[in-house]
Swiss-Prot record:
Homodecamer; pentamer of dimers. Signal peptide: none annotated. It comes from the Bacteria. Mg(2+) binds at residues 53, 92, 124. This is 3-methyl-2-oxobutanoate hydroxymethyltransferase. It catalyses: 3-methyl-2-oxobutanoate + (6R)-5,10-methylene-5,6,7,8-tetrahydrofolate + H2O = 2-dehydropantoate + (6S)-5,6,7,8-tetrahydrofolate. It is found in: Cytoplasm. It comes from Koribacter versatilis (strain Ellin345). The active site is at 191 (proton acceptor). The keyword Magnesium applies.
Amino acid sequence: MSIATGDFRSKVTSSTLLDKKSKHDPITCLTAYDYSTARLVDEAGIDMILVGDSLAQTMLGYENTLPVTMDEMLHHTRAVRRAVRHAFLIADMPYASYHVGGRESVRNAARFIKEGGAEAVKIEGGENRAALIDRLLDAEVPVVGHIGLTPQSVHRMGGYKVQGKTIRDIEQLMRDATALDRAGVVALVLEGIPREVAAMITAEVETPTIGIGAGPDCDGQVLVFHDILNLTFAPPAKFVRRYADAAELITGAVKAFRDDVKTGSYPSDDESYHLPKEAQATLEMVQNRKHAMRK
């Protein structure tokens, strides 16, 4: 039996994603890192929720995604799982959790399914990950691939740079996409690559492609929740579209609370609890006793 939210939407599964690709029905994906955010995103009708290792920056204040740990990722994945009823839930495997040999990599991935409640894990890399993906699928761990600009490779790439600009790089991206598609990934994230290259990959592979900075021709799009609400403290990437200024709204609300406390207008009498009238006499008796004891 499928789980449905109040509006009776059916649960999104890996089969749903394939069906959407075949019908040219765009797939939506956002990140979420906590219960409240995940509940809002899920109830808004987003198809996929990614507990991204970007939480290293958005939630924990790190400079990049590399420092976040397995325990931190599992902690946030469990919180999101408790909120999600509709979306397909994916957890990012953090840096050095799947670069450590096949057996330990499988064990780490399985923890996201068993302990975190994720329905798939996302790993970065191309054809060099095909063998690992085979092992993960053998262990009943669905995998989402991620090629192009892979943030965990920031030092090797020399920064966050658009990938796939040369013939050689385009050919490598095609080999990566084909290898992951054949390996059986349930979706493939294409990040930071030219629109034309993303369109070519999308037409070539059977798995749904999810773009982030890869143009409009992918099967779906993903953005970071904090980016679309202006809750980050750095200039946005070119591909980010901001849909609200939550930073301004939140700052305004916090300042208003501060001012109300300072001026004494919060809390008001209506926002305070009161003794019932019959108990007020008892309070007066207690106060009178205290006064008598002081004399």
